[in-house]
UniProtKB/Swiss-Prot annotation:
One of its GO terms (molecular function) is metal ion binding. Belongs to the small Tim family. It is found in: Mitochondrion inner membrane. It comes from Caenorhabditis elegans. It is a peripheral membrane protein. Mitochondrial intermembrane chaperone that participates in the import and insertion of some multi-pass transmembrane proteins into the mitochondrial inner membrane. Also required for the transfer of beta-barrel precursors from the TOM complex to the sorting and assembly machinery (SAM complex) of the outer membrane. Acts as a chaperone-like protein that protects the hydrophobic precursors from aggregation and guide them through the mitochondrial intermembrane space. Residues 95-108 have a biased composition (Gly residues). It comes from the Eukaryota. This is Mitochondrial import inner membrane translocase subunit tim-13. Residues 89-108 are annotated as: Disordered. Pfam families: zf-Tim10_DDP. Disulfide bonds join 45-68, 49-64.
Length: 108
């Protein structure tokens, strides 16, 4: 299943095949999120904390980087938990996916 699948093709797959596709999409999304997180932390914290590039980090720069990364991760986790809770609430109120692909909850 290396080719692109449209919604109609996905609907024709067996439940096991649908689960494989969904699992693959979830894994790719998780990987992309992790890569974005690392990139964002690196860019934001480096720009904020390292004022003068050199061969080593000053003590204050190390502390700043640690605090920056900690705050960034706390914020990321809070947003992720809030979004996950909202998604679960919307799915529960709409009765789940409701009949197939492309009919998930709206985030408006």
């Amino acid at each position: 299943m290396d080719q692109l699948l449209d919604v109609e093709t996905l609907k024709k797959l067996s439940p096991e095949q649908q689960e494989q596709v969904i699992s693959g999409v979830k894994q790719q999304a998780a990987l992309a999120n992790a890569q974005n997180l690392v990139t964002d932390i690196s860019e934001k914290c480096t720009n904020k904390c390292i004022t003068a590039p050199g061969s080593s980090l000053a003590s204050g720069e190390k502390q700043c980087l640690q605090r920056c990364m900690d705050r960034f991760m706390e914020s990321w986790n809070l947003v992720s938990q809030t979004l996950q809770k909202r998604l679960q609430e919307e799915m529960a109120s709409s009765g789940g996916m409701g009949g197939g692909f492309g009919q998930g909850p709206s985030f408006s």
